Each structure stands twice: as structure tokens, then as C-alpha cells.
Amino acid sequence: MSIKASGGSPLARPQLYRTASILTITQAEQQDRFLQLGELNQLVSFLNSGQKRLEVADILTKNANILVARAADKIFVGGSAISYLERPQAAVIIAGDQSSQDKINELSGNIQGDFGQSFRSLFNAGGATPPGFKPINVLRYGTTRMRKSLRDLDWFLRYLTYAIVSGDPNILSVNIRGLRELIDNACSSAAAIVALREMRRTALLIFEEDIKGQDLVKEYFNVVISEFEAPSLTDKLRKRISGDLQGLRLPQTYVQAGVSTPRFVMKPSLSADEKNIVVKACYRQIFERDIAKAYDLSLSNLESQVKNGQISIKEFIRSLGTSSIYRKQFYEPFVNSRALELAFRHFLGRGPSSLEEFQKYFAILSSTGLSGLVNALLNSSEYTDYFGEETVPYFRNLGEEPQECRNWGPQIDLLTYSAPFRKVPQFITLFSDYKQSLPDQHPYGIGNDPLSIQFGAIFPKENKDPRKRQALFGKDTRRILVRRGPGIYNQISNPQVRPKSAGSLGPKIFKLSNALIKSDSSQNFENSVEVVTKVAYLRVFGREVYQEEKLILKPIESQLKDNQITVREFVRQLAKSSIFRSLYWEPLYICKAIEYIHNRLLGRPTYGRQEINKYFDIAYKQGYYQVIDTIIDSSEYTETFGDNTVPYERYSTPAGVALRSLRPGIIDQRFKKVIASKSARFVELGTVKEMRSSNDIQSRISQGVTSLRDQSIVFEVNSDSNKEMLEQALRAAYRQIFERDLNSFSVGGEFLDIKSAFLNRQICVKELVEKLALSELYGKEFYQPYPNTKVIELGTKHILGRAPNNQAEIRFFNQILASKGLSAFISNLVESVEYNAVYGKDTVPYRRFPTLPAANFPNTETLYNRLTKQDISIVVPSFKKVLGNQ
């Protein structure tokens, strides 16, 4: 396998054991259904017995020392075995509880030299003694082995309590099966069996008066002993038929610990409900959802055939894979490479294993299409071996069978729920990376390289680009770093030029020279120290320090000014300060923190794993301060900066160099660079460039303003209005609402009643407008012939005297029209805050924006100048799409 690429290592947490609740819920979740009555009863039974289980586990924990002591005395002679039990592993005994300690001593007994009595006690315990058992002498066995043996006995008891609390003996089966061979290699498994039986007998005596507790303890102790006596399980092998595929094995404990994927098999003897469950499992595997439940879709013809036994499950899967639903969901939206990966997921329950396998099926997909790929997968010998004719395909993921390491990451990602949302192919990209050289990035991920900017430790996020690629860097792999200055001064090819300055091609170097220190001009020296101090702050912290932080660093500055410490020691103290540590050590991962510190203090990133692993080891074993000392006391720091030079950047990554430079290749050449003007654009455009006369100015002032503004008449009714004025207001209301005068038409009694009520002052102008708009004539002329959007435009024109303000207003009134009808729409307009503020109760509505300026003047102008009966098109608002306008 190539060492130049890696499939990555996504977070995988294989299940270590099962519990009663996890097993029940997971099985229902895998089948996409609710819990059945029997499963609910199991959960109820488990929860009801929870208090009893906790009580039994608590009693066993409190008597752990007694149980371990009796078991140890059963197999050890010639000393006090319980004394070898390490306190952190044992049950806690309350200090001063002399009765508990006396009971342990009483149960342990003084068996030093009473070998015969201990040997005879074996035959009084009940049960056959395992063949090959001999009591073990404590002194000959040794202190180290005694501690391990007592630790193991305590371990058995602790895991017994875990299983009792979880309600499932699976944790015992997973962890105890196979220990017999391991203990046989160290001491004697027969002695362990005797000790476990004695522990069981003592525990049953403790629960002698509690029948339920005794049954519970006996059940789980029997599992412990039976699993220990049973032979270890063989590994689960995954044989391959091709030389380019990996042969793999998986320990059976992983299979036992997890919840196995359910197998759905179609049999003629199944009931109708069971056959429906199998069909739904096919839908979930191929379409990743139950299409009958989610979209109310079903392939009734195929379903009836598979239920009646006319076609097998394999042929049913073939029909689903070649259906139009599958084609639209998992073939047409993707490129062929990704469609191939998803087909492997759906029909074989795994991802492509090798480049050769990928090329084989990619050629089939390219030449014969989706149907050819589905047929090739279903006709393969692998499908026949795993699923046959009657079994629904299932995911062969982690815990189900061994996984390949070369496509570990993409395989786990492919079997997740979000796989269809990823458009970029993973496997072919990984397989191509096997043959490519290593990328130029940090050995522990590109996200560990700080961005090459001045301020602080800013690291790029790797989760923004889904096409991230991992690479397997070896310890001897070294990164390519770009030298600041002439390439001939690179320290890899020429280490002797480390202290040599790069001159004008390199960074600015600040150095506190000895000549300046010895100078008589103290003023120059003070200025020099201030400059060096400020530059050191910028280099180490990435920014200037705050006033409160300066108070903390003041003593260190004073020592530098008094020539008590060198610049090198000054940098060391800054890196060890609480300010630096709180910024760039405590909140970051160790890898990122070391990379930042190394870059700031030595002026370059790390070369590779070999260098950064050294700092990992120092940080773990000796702490943070030793990491700083190791960097500053290194020969590279001494040769490059000496004692009086502030560290500066010497090397950068290629990505950092590209980040700082503006290359012509990345600039869009279609547009010329726009030079920003010094003055605002509206000032420049508004500047008068020619001489204007007074007549010219007057004509420009009146530009766009017509006589409509001066000629507009507002009809208002008050207490002094006579009958003639009331009739004028009534006719104005007719013209505003119906866009014409109604006197020349024969109208029914509805308008006569409204006219009479208004002239007799029984209703106000506002009520008059509402009654006119709610009349049958208005609905016939302005509501029934038009769509809702046009009705809204006409309603705002007639009642509010303007066009709609924006799309949000149209959408609001559209909801009212659709749900409550015309009457609610008219009432909402008349009772609106805008109507009351503009017209009140006694003013007839009128056109409010006859001339500029007005925000919706263009729409209002178009709406009023258009003949309603001759043009039924909708006036579209001319506002831009901005927040609040949509």
C-alpha cells in the first residue's frame, strides 16, 4: 500500500457493550418503526427493576472486600492475601469503621501455616473442584503476581455490578470470554474458577433473606463462570476472491458488543405484516427511506409479485435499482464516480475496495449505464455469498465485519445518513492520491498551520472544504519552507549562514548592540530599548500589549533597561508569562500551540513529525516551560539570533507566501482597477460645471412638477357642511371608489339606502367608503374579474390613494384575501393606521402622490393613468430586493 495518502480517520466509536434499553430501542430505530407492545413491556420491566438492581449493586460494592477476601483465601495459603489488594481498586471502607475491618479479618482468618484447614475447606464449599487445581503459596507466588491476582478478582466483581445495573449480561460475555487462555499463561485458570465459585457462594449468603436479589446475583455469577470456562471465540474472517483486495479479520467481541444489523429474509411462510416489513426494508436500503411512508409512493405491482413469490428479493432489488425513482435520486444529480460509490452502498453495503475494482465497474457504468451497473453488482459472486436470493442487502459497517484500512475514512463516511448530500467523489480521489506525491501541508493537518499574518495565532478551519485530503506523512518527511531572502542562504543546504542577514531582501532586524549600550548617550540607549521592547511584543504576542498587561511586564522591561538580562532572556520571560500562556497555550490544542510558539520564537514553522514529536514528548513529560527553554536554548536560536537580536521571520510556508502576494494570475482581468475618488460620487455629479441664468435655474426647479399638485381638491365633511356639500362629497366618493359617477346609472336600493344614510348624517365618510367598497357592484367590477394581486392594487388605489408599497405588503394582503375574502381585506384597509392618520373619519380618499417626490410615485402614476377596463395587467413594484421589502 502507498504511504503517500490516507483515507483519513473520522471519529469511530465502536459499541463496547449492550444494555437492555439500548438493544430494544436500537432494533426499533433500525427498522424505522415505533416500539411494539412487547418491547415496551421489556422496557417497563427493566425500569421497574431498576431500584432493585441498584440496591443489589450497592450491597455488592460495600461488601467487595469481603467477597474478594473469601475468594482469595480459597486459593492462596501461607499469608494474608487480602493485604495485597490495592486500595484504589478496592471498595472504599469508611475510615474508623472498625466493625467492617474486624469482619474482614474474621472472614480472612489467620491461615499462615494452617495449610490443612484451608485445603479441607475446599470440600465444604459445594461443587466439584476443577481438575489441576492446587492451592497457591503466597510467599512463592510473589508480591507482583499477588497484586495482579487480587486486582483481577476485584475486576470480575466490578464488571458483575456493571452488568447488573445495565440489565444485560452482554458486558460480561464481551470482556470475559477468552480470558481463560490468558490466565493459563500467567498462573492457573482452575484457581480462578475456584475463586469465582467461592465469590458466588459468599454473595448468595449475603442475600440469603432476599430471594429476588439472590436470584439476580446467581444469574449473573453463572454467566461470569460459564463465560470464563468457555473457549475463546475465533476471529471473523473476510475472505477475498481477488489479489488486489485485502484479507481481513475481526475479533468476535466487536460483533457481540454491538447491535447487529437486522437481516430481513423473505420466506413464503411469513405473514402479510412480516412481508410488508421486508418490503419496507428494501425501500430503506435502496432509497434510504421508506418511500411509502415519506412520499406516499409504492410500486404495487412489484410488491405483489415479491409477496406472492413470483419474483425473489434479489429481482425486486434489481427492479428498484433500475426504476425511475432511483435514477432521479441517486444517478442523475451526481457524476458517474459518485453514482458508482452510492450504488456500492445501496447494493453491496460497502464502498469500493480498490482502484482496480473501481475501474472495472466504472467501465460498466460508462458503457451500459445505470441498469448495467446494477446488474453487474447483483450478479456478482459477492452479492450471492452475502445476500443470496432472499436476503435484503444491509450495511456491512464497523462492528458488522472487518474494515479495510486503505479506504477507512471514505468507507465510514459513505455509510452515514448524509452521504447522498455529498456531491464530490471520495474513493477515486483517494485512490488517485495513492500515486501522487505528498502535498505541501502540515503533517498533522493543514489546520495546524497558522495564517501568515501579523496578529496572533489564527488557524484556518478544515471543515469549510468538503474535498479535504489526508496524507500519511512519515517521520522522515520534511516540509518545503520558503526562505525570506536569497535561496542560497537556506539553512538546510548551508547551515553555516544562519546568522547571516538577508539584507534588503529579508525582514527588518532589530538588534540591541553592545556599542550602543556602552555609549555615553543615555537618550539613544533608552530609545533603542523602547524600540526593541515594542518589536519584541509584536513578535511574541502578535500585537501590542494593553496598559494593564504592561504593568505585569514592567519588571521584565526594567531588567532589560538596566542591562540585567539580554534580549534572549527577555523573549524567554515573555513566552513564559501568564499573558502569552493564556493566549496561545491554554485555549489551543498542543499541536497548534507548539506550531505557533515555534514559528514565533524560531522564526519558522516546524519541518515535520520528527521535530514536532520531540516537543510533544517534552510538553507531556516536563511541561510547558521546558518547551520554551528547549526552543530558546537550541543551537539554531543561538546561531541565528544570539543574545541581543529580536527573533524575526526567516521561513514561511508556500501558502503563506501566496497569501501575502497579489499574483496577476488570481486577478480578474475583465475589469480594470477602479481608483477610488477622493470626494463622494454624489458631490462630483452634483457639481455645476457651467454658468446658468436665473430663468434656467427657475425652469430646473419646477422640473417634474405639474399643475396636478395645485389643482387637487380634498373633499371634507364637517358639522357646518350643508346638503349640497354632502352631495359633492358623496359624488367624490363614487368617483374615487368606482372611478366614475354613478348618477347616470340605474342603481338598486342598496345605494339609495347608503346615500340616504349619508345625507342624513347617520354614517360618516369613513363608513360611507367602507359600505361602497363592500357593495355587490364593487365586487362585480373590481374583485371577481381579477386575480388577488390586481385586487390588492385596486384596493389600495381606491381606499388609500396609492399603489402598494412593496412585495411584503402585497403578500400580507394576499394572505387576508385568500383566507378571509374581500370583506376582511376592505375592513383591514379602512381600519388601518395609515387611513386614520391621512383621511380620518370625514375626508374622502384622494390620490396622495400626484407629483414627485414620492417613494412609490412611478407605480402610483402608472396605476392612475391606466384605464382599468382596457388593461388588466398587474403593476409590478419597481423596488429593489432588500431586507424588509420582500
From Swiss-Prot:
Enzyme Commission number(s) from the entry: 4.-.-.-
Entry keyword set: Antenna complex, Bile pigment, Chloroplast, Chromophore, Electron transport, Lyase, Membrane, Photosynthesis, Phycobilisome, Plastid, Repeat, Thylakoid, Transport
GO cellular component, one term: phycobilisome
Domain PBS-linker as annotated: residue spans: 244-424, 496-678, 695-876
Domain of life of the source: Eukaryota
InterPro entries documented for this protein: Globin-like_sf (IPR009050), PBS_linker_dom (IPR001297), PBS_linker_sf (IPR038255), Phycobilisome_asu/bsu (IPR012128), Phycobilisome_asu/bsu_sf (IPR038719)
Pfam family, one: Phycobilisome
Transmembrane domains' residue ranges: none
PROSITE patterns for this protein: PBS_LINKER (PS51445)
Enzyme class: lyase
Membrane topology: Peripheral membrane protein
Binding-site residues, (2R,3E)-phycocyanobilin: 187
GO molecular function annotation: lyase activity
Places the protein is found: Plastid, Chloroplast thylakoid membrane
Cross-referenced CDD domains: PBP_PBS-LCM (cd12128)
Post-translational changes noted in the entry: Contains one covalently linked bilin chromophore. This protein autochromophorylates (Potential).
Main location: plastid
UniProt cross-references to SUPFAM superfamilies, sorted A to Z: Globin-like
UniProt GO BP: photosynthesis
Function field: This protein is postulated to act both as terminal energy acceptor and as a linker polypeptide that stabilizes the phycobilisome architecture. May have intrinsic bilin lyase activity.
Family designation: Belongs to the phycobilisome linker protein family.
Protein name as annotated: Phycobiliprotein ApcE
Biological source species: Pyropia yezoensis
Organism placement in taxonomy: Eukaryota, Rhodophyta, Bangiophyceae, Bangiales, Bangiaceae
